[in-house]
Structure formats: structure tokens, C-alpha cells
Amino acid sequence: MSGGRDSSTSSGSNSAAPGASTNATSSASASASSTSTSASPGSTTSPASTQRQRGRPAKRATCTWCGEGKLPLQYVLPTQTGKKEFCSETCIAEFRKAYSKGACTQCDNVIRDGAPNKEFCSIMCMNKHQKKNCSTRHSGGSASGKGLAESERKLLASGAPAPTGPFQYESFHVFDWDAYLEETGSEAAPAKCFKQAQNPPNNDFKIGMKLEALDPRNVTSTCIATVVGVLGSRLRLRLDGSDSQNDFWRLVDSTEIHAIGHCEKNGGMLQPPLGFRMNASSWPGYLCKILNNAMVAPEEIFQPEPPEPEENLFKVGQKLEAVDKKNPQLICCATVDAIKDDQIHVTFDGWRGAFDYWCNYRSRDIFPAGWCARSCHPMQPPGHKSRMDSSSSKQRCPRPRYTVVAESEAMVPASPATAHFHPNCKGGPFINNSKLPCMVTGPTYQTLAKLCLQEVLAASTDTQQLSKLLFALEGDVHIVTAAGKNFTVKIPSPMRMKDDESLAQFIETLCTTCRACANLISLVHETEECKKCANSRKRQLTQSATPPSSPVLADKRNRQSNSATTSPSEKIIKQELAVKSPVESKSKTSTNNGKEPASQQNSNHSLNNNNNSASKSSNKVVIKSEPNGANAQTSSTTQALRKVRFQHHANTNTNSSATNGNQDTSQTTHVSTSHCSSSSTSSSTSLAGGSANTSTIGKYLAPLVAEVHPEQANVKPSNSYYKSPTTLSSSASLPTSVSTPFTGCQSASSTALAAGGVTAAKAATAPAGAAATAGASPSYTAITSPVSTPTSALANSHLRSQPIDWTIEEVIQYIESNDNSLAVHGDLFRKHEIDGKALLLLNSEMMMKYMGLKLGPALKICNLVNKVNGRRNNLAL
């Protein structure tokens, strides 16, 4: 039992402060709240404990009533001869009943049944008393002393206040603020800095009264609370339906407490408290039961809330009284250690930094100096760090000395350290930056680093992979909680994080590890947008705004951007299918009639070899583009062609398409192909006798659509006209981009365009050797053709038509092809043997309960199951 928490007093200082209210001395539960044994700021060591530092250890204290020595003695009853300690409210109540009937004259203990004498609890006490008072045993003084003791016992049993008697229930020393301020050379914070009344409000509440209060763990709920303790101007409340472990304290002028009926008048509804021990459906009946014949607190005893200060007027170093958040029944001597905006850092005098906290300057948990004395509330004096080394305080105080290392001065900044998140910056492959907060604040650098890791993990899209990366960092091992899970990470040791520079280095390492933008987390709030991410975003917007847009176009742009960093020899990309453009525009060209350089011939020969080797699994279109060079320069002026659609036929004249192979154009051609779901036997047969490129094209039977746009410069409509595709050169190189593909096969009749005068013609495909003789440049651009099917569609095409017949591997294949993030659950499906039949029966509750899936993946899989059921129903129709 901590002596400072007991507030033991001598006979000369046993009286309460002037004006002590009746409520402060009315019940045992109030004493219980004010005499808790847990260590806290302001709890001091009693003189008795300091005297027992040598020799034989002190005898373990036991409950005065039941003799229990294992339970903490949380309840103290001051008496004439000292104090009585108890383990529970029941023990202290029973002791008071027995004490009112009579007490031992020698030891002041209760006289139980079977005692040898009505005045003594035991023979030993009787013998001691006889030896001590043998000469005056029959004198009148003994009788008068006995009469005084009986009157005091009756006064104690009645519970009435005794301002000057030794049996006052709550007695405490009045802290001398003037002497303390003079000793420390500091000043007290003025009353205008606090959101507190000038004079502490009267507390007319009584234990057992019921009222409405906001649940401190869920401030949106209004619950029924019972007053279980009264101390000065404060109330100890317990939510009905909750246990005693969640009691909380409120001032009588708080806006969080109201009279019964206030919630209903304002259109609200009383809610069960968080952690309601009964069934939620029984709440209405339970509410009627507890309010029936209850002692309801009258509305007039609730005090109005005081006005709040207009701004933060605190100064560093000012003294005040503050509630200990870890032991809220205590108000202790404290100091303003730091100020930042609306926040102040409260430190408790004489204690290490474990109990310090940040709060708003409008907080109701801070009071001006002298508030406790005026409100008759016990005030805990400053602690003494030197006493923590004594053996008795080590046993009584739960604050270990090694905690000082975690809160060393090197780790505590002058003001709270703050890290700012910039959601506009890229979060990389592991972080969803939309889930990041704007900022986090920590009292120490290490705490801030831990908070940053916690927020990054909470916003992660793949916590399993990211936690491995964070654990690979250097530093001390810590456990952080994010998204309902515990993760083991590493944070630099306190000795390495001494200033902002070290913290900034850690944040930079964190961003690099997460593959995010270096400006995603910073110690300085930057209003300007990150230039790197802004430029990247502008490029994406420009690319997405360029019509027409398609996945093929994006793939081409990615390849073009990658080609800037590759050597010229790497720019020739392997292709599975080479398509020669059958479009030729009339242009004025000046060509070199000399022989083609050997490098160009080698490149063309390499291209033809690649075309022949990759024709079996063709998914890409490679179009040879010839820039304006020394050997071939073009200055074409053409009119924009609306659309040229052509189909592959068996009677394609490949020789006619190769006659104009030396003519070049600088037009921009948008090539789009679509995969034809139905196959044509005659077309594939007729194409079998052609070259490798021709046979490959015939295999897909996809109509190729060319949309030609001239360059913006030198556009002369009079010099442009359409040519029949049969007369267009197949070797004419056109810089290409891809338009939106067609979704189905088109017949020969549907490809004719009457409005623009564009006729549908046969697709001309040059032989493999034609490319070698054409005067073309060796630069090639590879773009993805829409002929290639998406991964999910290609994977699903191999599945059986009926999902009910799917095997386990087919189910896993279907899920992985539709959502790559669900691929990690493949082994789980194998473990539970989820085949097609089981897949159709899955629901989110079943997957979460029996398969251990989280809600997010379970909902994704349910969505895929619904798609399968929809397709199944369509097939049945």
C-alpha cells in the first residue's frame, strides 16, 4: 500500500481542508477511489516505509477484517490509532458494523464473538493493557477514556462528518502552492487559461443516483450511469450493464452528463454500454428494471459548463494541477513542458516521463493551482525520484527503473514530433495512399516512427509482403498493431534517433523500402504538390486523353518509353506476326536509287526470320516504320482518310502488293484488329498456301481496320485521294497507333464505306522475301494487337462450360485469372477441396468462419461466384 496514496496524517494534520463538503466524506467507495494502490504521479513514500530499509523485511500487510494477504489492499479507514487497510468494500463495511458495537481498548480492533472480555479482542491485549495501566485501572480517567471511544465509534458508524475528529473518512494535507512556487522559482498558470469555473461548482450528487452519460469508449452512445463515488467537484460513474473495470470520472459541470430524460427530449435513444454483459435484445427490459424506483439525480444539481478561453494562453514552465490519465482518481502537481498550436504537454513534477501526455488547452482534466483545495479534492504532491531507489518503493511502485531508457532525454523533443503524409504522392505497389491520414503526432521520435509504420501497414494492400520488408530494416524489434493484426517491425534504437535529421533519414528509408515516392512522408507540411508525381500524373492524363485509347495503345507507349533507355540493337523486338500495311498515299518522295546499306539488309533479314519463327503463337503486330533519313526522305501531304477496312481472302494478290515497296509515307495509321470468335474453314484453307505471315494472319481470321491520319503539317486535301487496297504497297511503312478494336467478325459486305468513297478490298500481304528488297529503315515499333486475348479471358477459355464440373485446379485457375490478389488463397482452396460444386455453395460467412478468410477477400470471391452463377443460368437458357 503506497503511503502517498493513503495520505496518512498525524494527529496535528488530521483535519480536512476548510469548507470540506459532506459528500467528500460520506461513503466507503469514495475512499476506495481516492486510496488506490497503483503508483502514480504524486504518490509519496510514508515515513514508516523509509525507516524499514535495513534489517528484517517488513511484515506483509493483510486485510484487517478477513486477513487476506494476496489481494491488494485498496481501501483505507483512518482511526485514532492509525489506519485500517481492507481488500474490498465488503470487508470495510463489515468492519464498520462490528466496530460500532465495540472495539478493543488496547489495539482498537473489533471484538469478535468468543472474546475473553467485552473490552479486549484477545487475552494478549488484555494482559498488555493491565501491565500498562495497572496503577490507574480503577481511576475515573479510564472510564472517561472509554466513554470518548464509544462516542467516536457511534460517530463513525453514523457516517456523519467530523471536521476535527480523528475518524473523518477522507483526510488529506492541503498542498502549499505558495511555498512550492517560491521554492521552484516558477509561476502558476492564471485561471483565464483554463476551461474551469472561477469557483469550483457545488457537488450535490449522492452515491446511488442515476443519470445519463456519454459512453467514454463510444461517445456517440448515451447510456444510464450510476454515481459510485463523490470526490470534491468530481463524480465517479459506472455505466449500468458494465463492470467496475470501466469506471470513469466527470466534473459536475460537464456537458457529458445530463438528467434522466434529456436524451429522449432531444430525439435520441438510450443505448447499452460498450461491453454490455447481457444479451442486447434484453436491453429494453433491463432499462425499465434499473429505472424503476431508482434514485434519479434532479436536474437542478447539474451545473452549466464554464466558458472556454479564446486562445491558448499557456506558457512553458507554468504550474498547474492535472488529472493522472492512468489513475484518473488522482489530481497531481504538473508543469506545462511544451506548447504546439492548441496542444500542451503536461508533465508531472517529480516523476519520470511515463505518465506525461498531450492535451488540448480546453481540456477539463487540467485545473489552476489551488483548485483542489477550494473544491475539497485531495491533491497529490510532487513525487521524489530519489525514493524510487529504496527497497520499499520498488515493491510498492509498479514503475520499473529501466523504463527511463525508453523515455530518455535524447528521445523527447521540445515539442511533439509530427509526420505529414501526402496522399497525392505515389504509394508504390504496397500502399494505398488514399487510406493514409494527413498527419500523425508522437511525443517522442521513436513513438512517431512506430506510428508511421503502423499507418503504412494499415494502408497496405499486401501486409504480408510489406511486413517482411519492414522487418528487414535495421534497429530494435517492436510489435505494432494495424488492421487488427500484430506485425513485427524494426525501428532504429533510441541512441540513433536523437534529432529530426535521424528521424528524416528513417522516414526516407521507409519510403524507399515501400517503393513509394520519397515525399510521401515528411516532417514538414508541404502545401505544394510533389513535382515528380505531378509530372507523372500529367503524362498519364495526356496519354489517357489522346483518342482513341485502348490497352494496345498503352502497351505501345510503355514500349516506346522503355526503348529510350535501350540500345539500338535492343529496339528490334521479337514479334509473332508481321503485318504489312496495304495503304499507300500519293506523295512526292525523293529516294536514293543506290543500294541499300548492309545494316538495313541485315535488319530486314532478321525481321523476316523472326516473323517465320514466331508465326505459330502470334499475339503482336510489328509495323516497320521508316523515319526521314539520309537514304530516304519523305514530304508527303495527304488528306485524312476516314477509315479503310479490309479483309483477308484466299485470292489475295501478294505480287501486286510488292510492286510499290519503295514508296514511303509519313502518315499516322491507327491499326485495330479484333479476334473473331467464329472460324471460317474456307478462308483458313485458302491462306495455307501463302507465306508464313499470310498463314498466320489467316489463322485468326480477324478483319484489320486501318485508320489513317496525316501529319498536322503540310496538309493538302487536293493532293490526297484513296487508293484501292489491292494497289497499295504492302511494304509502305506507317507509324502506327491503335484504335478501338472491333468486337466481332465482319463480313465482306459490312466493310464497305459508301460515304467516304472508301471501298472494301482484299488484304495484300507481301511474301517473306519482299521485306528484304524494300527500301525500308531498320527501326521497328512493336505494338500489341487486339488479336491477343486478355489473360483472364484466355485462361477462362480453357475452363469447362459448366462450372459445376470444374475441378479444384480449375476453380483456382478461374479465381486467379479474374483477380491476381486472390492467388495467395490457392492453397486454401486445395486444403478445403473446393471444386465447382463447392464453389457455387460458398458465401462470405462460410469462408470467414471455416476458411479463415478476411471480409475483403471473401466478398471478392462471392462476387466471382455470383458471376459464375449468372453465366450458368445463361447457359441453361
From Swiss-Prot:
Keywords: Chromatin regulator, Developmental protein, Metal-binding, Nucleus, Phosphoprotein, Repeat, Repressor, Transcription, Transcription regulation, Zinc, Zinc-finger
Binding site for Zn(2+): 63, 66, 87, 91
Record-level Gene Ontology MF annotations: chromatin binding; histone binding; identical protein binding; PRC1 complex binding; sequence-specific DNA binding; zinc ion binding
Positions bearing Phosphoserine: 549-550, 585
Residues carrying Phosphothreonine: 546
Residue ranges of MBT repeats: 175-273, 281-382
Zinc finger (FCS-type): 54-93
GO cellular component, one term: polytene chromosome
Subcellular location: Nucleus
Amino acid composition bias (Polar residues), ranges on this chain: 560-569
Alphabetical GO biological process terms: anterior/posterior axis specification; axonogenesis; compound eye development; follicle cell of egg chamber stalk formation; germarium-derived female germ-line cyst encapsulation; heterochromatin formation; negative regulation of DNA-templated transcription; negative regulation of growth
Any Pfam family hit: MBT
Amino acid composition bias (Low complexity), ranges on this chain: 7-50, 598-620, 724-735
Effect of residue 860 to E: Complete loss of function. Partial loss of self-binding activity. Complete loss of ph-p binding activity
Coiled coil: none
Region of interest (Disordered), residue spans: 1-57, 535-621, 652-692, 713-735
Keyword Magnesium appears in the UniProt entry: no
Function: Polycomb group (PcG) protein. PcG proteins act by forming multiprotein complexes, which are required to maintain the transcriptionally repressive state of homeotic genes throughout development. PcG proteins are not required to initiate repression, but to maintain it during later stages of development. They probably act via the methylation of histones, rendering chromatin heritably changed in its expressibility.
Free-text comment about domains: The SAM domain is essential for function.
Assembly mode: Scm associates with the PRC1 core complex containing PSC, PC, PH and Sce/RING1. Forms homotypic and heterotypic interactions. Interacts with the SAM domain of ph-p via its SAM domain in vitro. Interacts with corto in vitro.
Family stated for the protein in its record: Belongs to the SCM family.
UniProt-recorded name of the protein: Polycomb protein Scm
